Amino acid sequence: MSQADMTCSARQRVFQEALRKGNTKELHSLLQNMTNCEFNVNSFGPEGQTALHQSVIDGNLELVKLLVKFGADTRLANRDGWSALHIAAFGGHQDIVLYLITRAKYSSSAL
């Protein structure tokens, strides 16, 4: 089934599966084709994390950048009250910490 033929709910399930696998290429393709869906990249999953939080936990800088490009809010707190920056710092993901801080510095919205 092509992505064009998938329903919005099917795309969201495929998105969640690609996120769990860290499949950046598949996620990029899905995000580009979600325009007709009411899909919120900032929605919280059953674990109380957004896709961005989960990508930071996994230490996947490429996926973090992709999600931010498609509107992931770096300021959102997870169920424990931690932002993506908090999670990155706690997890020792220095590359993600640097990216988030640099992005905030040159963005109109702060972390």
UniProtKB/Swiss-Prot annotation:
Pfam families associated with the record: Ank_2 (PF12796)
Keywords assigned: ANK repeat, Developmental protein, Notch signaling pathway, Repeat, Transcription, Transcription regulation
GO biological process, one term: sprouting angiogenesis
GO molecular function annotations of the record: chloroplast targeting sequence binding
InterPro entries the UniProt entry points to: Ankyrin_rpt, Ankyrin_rpt-contain_sf, PP1_Regulatory_Subunit
ANK repeats: 47-76, 80-109
Functional summary from the UniProt entry: Regulates independently canonical Wnt and Notch signaling by modulating LEF1 and Notch protein turnover. Stabilizes LEF1, a pivotal transcription factor in the Wnt signaling cascade, by blocking its ubiquitination. Involved in angiogenesis; involved in intersegmental vessel patterning during development.
UniProt xrefs under PANTHER family: MYOSIN BINDING SUBUNIT, ISOFORM O, PROTEIN PHOSPHATASE 1 REGULATORY SUBUNIT 12
Family to which this protein belongs: Belongs to the NRARP family.
Protein's UniProt name: Notch-regulated ankyrin repeat-containing protein B
Gene behind this protein: nrarpb
